[in-house]
């Protein structure tokens, strides 16, 4: 028997044991990080397939390597499915991540030093929307819009004022910690007023858009980028969508040969599987349940006296302000981690805590919804989190509760 024929456990016990530990952690814990989810077995099988052996620089029908007749079909299938999913004229499925997709959008459509208007990171934006530690903040002149202090929602008149004042070449509509519907039509209206391109980053809400549970960005945005995991429930990776053929050409050239060489065809195959799953009627039910669960869970916390940022949620996530409880995001994360409840710490609009700690936590329901939880289970989820935040040891109860919901 060759090494390649041996079972994984025989070939490398150290790695296999760690994978088994992670599988057990996922099985017995409560996963409430808004950007995480559980893929289907079919997605994992595709990603772990022999397609990982194949180099395929270029695009279907235009490769630099021979032997690409099969991976051409795989990639084209992914392209066709994601175009159908988002009603797009063009798609690129090669970006390795959401950040690399965003990088390609910037470099294809604007120049270094150009002004870009995006959401402030501390108000729910993303690192790639202009943070000074990120390429976006280093290479471009970034202007940030913030949420309304009272409503904690996007203030479109403030966006308009900043757009007219700074005349950005690009406006970004999208967020990583914003719980309300994004009005892409209103963003496009402002972009047109100042002659800017509208870039929609839908990484967090892509699955909700695909299911019709959030307005589609593409009829309004010049370009759309997203991850393929999170609410879309696929492998970790990125996509870019557009309708304008000239913009599409620029984006294709920027992804390859501009920033990437060989695409990860095993990941693209897994993307194709996930897109196929998202096209099924039951995915609409899943996306709808994500939102129902998030709203129910937010309501449970409000009944317990916690402050939910903006008063609720329209999507898959919400933010809890823990400052009234004498906690910050870092302290809360430690308390919850000790009980095998995973969330992410978060800054809050107009936060008074240091950015490294944040004044609260971000909670999301995609993963627990994948496991089969419904609104009825959110009472117990909220109770376990509340007790853990108060210093109780609820680890055994978390294990018992989570163990009743199988992983896909």
Swiss-Prot record:
Entries under Gene3D superfamilies matching the protein: Aspartate Aminotransferase, domain 1, Type I PLP-dependent aspartate aminotransferase-like (Major domain)
SUPFAM superfamilies: PLP-dependent transferases
EC numbers, comma separated: 2.1.2.1
GO biological process: glycine biosynthetic process from serine; tetrahydrofolate interconversion; tetrahydrofolate metabolic process
Modified residues (N6-(pyridoxal phosphate)lysine): 230
GO cellular component: cytoplasm; cytosol
Binding site for (6S)-5,6,7,8-tetrahydrofolate: 121, 125-127, 246
Catalytic activity: (6R)-5,10-methylene-5,6,7,8-tetrahydrofolate + glycine + H2O = (6S)-5,6,7,8-tetrahydrofolate + L-serine
Site residues by UniProt (Plays an important role in substrate specificity): 229
Keywords: Amino-acid biosynthesis, Cytoplasm, One-carbon metabolism, Pyridoxal phosphate, Transferase
Entry's localization field: Cytoplasm
Cofactor field: pyridoxal 5'-phosphate
Main location: cytoplasm
Pfam families hit by this protein: SHMT
Pathway the protein acts in: One-carbon metabolism; tetrahydrofolate interconversion; Amino-acid biosynthesis; glycine biosynthesis; glycine from L-serine: step 1/1
GO terms of molecular function: glycine hydroxymethyltransferase activity; pyridoxal phosphate binding
Subunit structure, as described in the record: Homodimer.
Function, as annotated: Catalyzes the reversible interconversion of serine and glycine with tetrahydrofolate (THF) serving as the one-carbon carrier. This reaction serves as the major source of one-carbon groups required for the biosynthesis of purines, thymidylate, methionine, and other important biomolecules. Also exhibits THF-independent aldolase activity toward beta-hydroxyamino acids, producing glycine and aldehydes, via a retro-aldol mechanism.
Family as reported in the entry's similarity comment: Belongs to the SHMT family.
Protein name: Serine hydroxymethyltransferase
Organism: Deinococcus radiodurans (strain ATCC 13939 / DSM 20539 / JCM 16871 / CCUG 27074 / LMG 4051 / NBRC 15346 / NCIMB 9279 / VKM B-1422 / R1)
